[in-house]
Amino acid sequence: GLLKNELQKIEFYSKNKKLTSEAILKLTNLTENFSMSELIDNCLAKNQKKTILILNENNFSNEDCIQIIRLFLNKLKKILQLSKELEKNNNLEKTISEARPPIFWKDKEITKKQISIWKTKNIKNLIYKLNEIELSMKKNFNISINLVTNFILEQSTLKTNN
Protein backbone atom coordinates (compact mmCIF):
# COMPACT_ATOMS: atom_id res chain seq x y z
CA GLY A 1 0.00 0.00 0.00
CA LEU A 2 2.48 2.65 1.16
CA LEU A 3 5.18 1.72 -1.36
CA LYS A 4 2.63 1.63 -4.20
CA ASN A 5 1.46 5.15 -3.26
CA GLU A 6 5.05 6.41 -3.25
CA LEU A 7 5.74 4.86 -6.67
CA GLN A 8 2.56 6.40 -8.10
CA LYS A 9 3.62 9.77 -6.71
CA ILE A 10 6.99 9.46 -8.46
CA GLU A 11 5.35 8.34 -11.71
CA PHE A 12 2.89 11.25 -11.65
CA TYR A 13 5.59 13.81 -10.84
CA SER A 14 8.05 12.52 -13.43
CA LYS A 15 5.77 12.78 -16.49
CA ASN A 16 7.63 14.90 -19.05
CA LYS A 17 10.33 15.79 -16.49
CA LYS A 18 13.85 14.64 -15.82
CA LEU A 19 13.86 12.97 -12.42
CA THR A 20 16.83 13.39 -10.09
CA SER A 21 17.67 11.37 -7.00
CA GLU A 22 17.12 14.53 -4.90
CA ALA A 23 13.61 14.88 -6.29
CA ILE A 24 12.86 11.25 -5.45
CA LEU A 25 14.10 11.75 -1.90
CA LYS A 26 11.88 14.82 -1.51
CA LEU A 27 8.87 13.03 -2.95
CA THR A 28 9.19 9.90 -0.88
CA ASN A 29 9.12 10.25 2.83
CA LEU A 30 9.18 6.60 3.80
CA THR A 31 11.69 7.33 6.52
CA GLU A 32 12.21 10.45 8.55
CA ASN A 33 15.83 11.41 8.82
CA PHE A 34 16.79 12.26 12.38
CA SER A 35 20.00 13.90 13.42
CA MET A 36 22.60 12.46 15.73
CA SER A 37 21.83 15.27 18.16
CA GLU A 38 18.19 14.20 18.35
CA LEU A 39 19.32 10.65 19.06
CA ILE A 40 21.56 11.78 21.91
CA ASP A 41 19.00 14.22 23.34
CA ASN A 42 16.26 11.60 23.41
CA CYS A 43 18.57 8.99 24.87
CA LEU A 44 19.61 11.32 27.71
CA ALA A 45 15.98 12.33 28.28
CA LYS A 46 15.14 8.61 28.70
CA ASN A 47 12.70 8.86 25.79
CA GLN A 48 13.01 5.18 24.92
CA LYS A 49 10.38 5.04 22.14
CA LYS A 50 11.84 8.01 20.26
CA THR A 51 15.41 6.71 20.75
CA ILE A 52 14.48 3.32 19.28
CA LEU A 53 12.59 5.01 16.43
CA ILE A 54 15.64 7.11 15.55
CA LEU A 55 17.95 4.08 15.68
CA ASN A 56 15.56 2.14 13.42
CA GLU A 57 14.94 4.97 10.95
CA ASN A 58 18.57 5.99 10.47
CA ASN A 59 21.19 3.82 8.90
CA PHE A 60 24.21 4.79 10.96
CA SER A 61 27.55 3.41 9.81
CA ASN A 62 30.67 2.47 11.75
CA GLU A 63 32.13 5.80 10.59
CA ASP A 64 29.20 7.70 12.13
CA CYS A 65 29.93 6.15 15.52
CA ILE A 66 32.96 8.31 16.26
CA GLN A 67 30.89 11.41 15.53
CA ILE A 68 28.05 10.13 17.74
CA ILE A 69 30.52 9.48 20.59
CA ARG A 70 32.06 12.98 20.20
CA LEU A 71 28.63 14.65 20.18
CA PHE A 72 27.58 12.54 23.16
CA LEU A 73 30.68 13.58 25.12
CA ASN A 74 30.14 17.26 24.31
CA LYS A 75 26.50 17.05 25.40
CA LEU A 76 27.43 15.25 28.61
CA LYS A 77 30.07 17.84 29.47
CA LYS A 78 27.47 20.59 29.03
CA ILE A 79 24.95 18.72 31.20
CA LEU A 80 27.68 18.07 33.79
CA GLN A 81 28.40 21.80 33.98
CA LEU A 82 24.67 22.58 34.34
CA SER A 83 24.21 19.81 36.91
CA LYS A 84 27.02 21.22 39.07
CA GLU A 85 25.45 24.67 38.83
CA LEU A 86 22.06 23.24 39.82
CA GLU A 87 23.63 21.58 42.88
CA LYS A 88 24.93 25.01 43.94
CA ASN A 89 21.82 27.13 43.40
CA ASN A 90 19.07 24.47 43.62
CA ASN A 91 17.03 26.39 41.01
CA LEU A 92 16.47 24.70 37.64
CA GLU A 93 15.04 27.79 35.90
CA LYS A 94 17.96 29.96 37.05
CA THR A 95 20.46 27.29 35.98
CA ILE A 96 18.97 27.15 32.49
CA SER A 97 18.53 30.92 32.04
CA GLU A 98 22.06 31.76 33.25
CA ALA A 99 23.81 29.00 31.28
CA ARG A 100 26.83 30.09 29.25
CA PRO A 101 26.79 29.69 26.33
CA PRO A 102 23.02 30.27 26.38
CA ILE A 103 20.75 27.31 25.70
CA PHE A 104 18.75 27.66 22.49
CA TRP A 105 15.04 28.11 23.24
CA LYS A 106 14.08 24.91 21.40
CA ASP A 107 16.49 22.89 23.56
CA LYS A 108 15.47 24.28 26.96
CA GLU A 109 12.73 21.75 27.81
CA ILE A 110 14.71 18.66 26.89
CA THR A 111 17.78 20.07 28.67
CA LYS A 112 15.70 20.61 31.84
CA LYS A 113 14.53 17.01 31.64
CA GLN A 114 18.09 15.74 31.16
CA ILE A 115 19.41 17.75 34.11
CA SER A 116 16.57 16.44 36.28
CA ILE A 117 17.36 12.84 35.34
CA TRP A 118 21.16 12.86 35.41
CA LYS A 119 23.10 13.81 38.52
CA THR A 120 26.79 14.75 38.52
CA LYS A 121 28.05 11.31 39.59
CA ASN A 122 25.99 9.53 36.91
CA ILE A 123 27.17 11.93 34.21
CA LYS A 124 30.81 11.36 35.13
CA ASN A 125 30.24 7.60 34.95
CA LEU A 126 28.71 7.99 31.48
CA ILE A 127 31.71 10.02 30.32
CA TYR A 128 34.06 7.26 31.53
CA LYS A 129 31.94 4.59 29.79
CA LEU A 130 31.95 6.56 26.54
CA ASN A 131 35.73 6.93 26.68
CA GLU A 132 36.02 3.15 27.15
CA ILE A 133 33.69 2.56 24.20
CA GLU A 134 35.69 4.93 22.03
CA LEU A 135 38.87 3.06 22.92
CA SER A 136 37.21 -0.28 22.08
CA MET A 137 36.00 1.15 18.78
CA LYS A 138 39.52 2.21 17.86
CA LYS A 139 40.80 -1.29 18.67
CA ASN A 140 38.07 -3.05 16.67
CA PHE A 141 36.37 -0.67 14.25
CA ASN A 142 34.05 -3.33 12.81
CA ILE A 143 31.98 -3.55 15.99
CA SER A 144 31.57 0.23 16.43
CA ILE A 145 27.88 0.33 15.54
CA ASN A 146 27.12 -2.52 17.96
CA LEU A 147 28.99 -0.85 20.82
CA VAL A 148 27.32 2.52 20.29
CA THR A 149 23.83 1.12 19.72
CA ASN A 150 24.05 -1.07 22.83
CA PHE A 151 25.26 1.87 24.90
CA ILE A 152 22.46 4.14 23.66
CA LEU A 153 19.75 1.54 24.24
CA GLU A 154 21.14 0.78 27.69
CA GLN A 155 21.16 4.45 28.71
CA SER A 156 17.70 5.22 27.34
CA THR A 157 16.14 2.36 29.31
CA LEU A 158 18.17 2.19 32.53
CA LYS A 159 16.74 3.72 35.66
CA THR A 160 19.20 6.18 37.15
CA ASN A 161 19.98 6.00 40.83
CA ASN A 162 19.81 9.61 41.94
Model-derived regions, located:
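Non-catalytic interfacial helical region
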Residues: 1-41, 45, 116, 133-144, ...
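Small-residue-rich helix-loop
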Residues: 18-122, 159-160
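Short coil/turn segments at secondary-structure boundaries
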Residues: 22, 83-86, 127, 142-146
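Short helix/strand-capping connector loops at secondary-structure junctions
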Residues: 109-111, 126-136
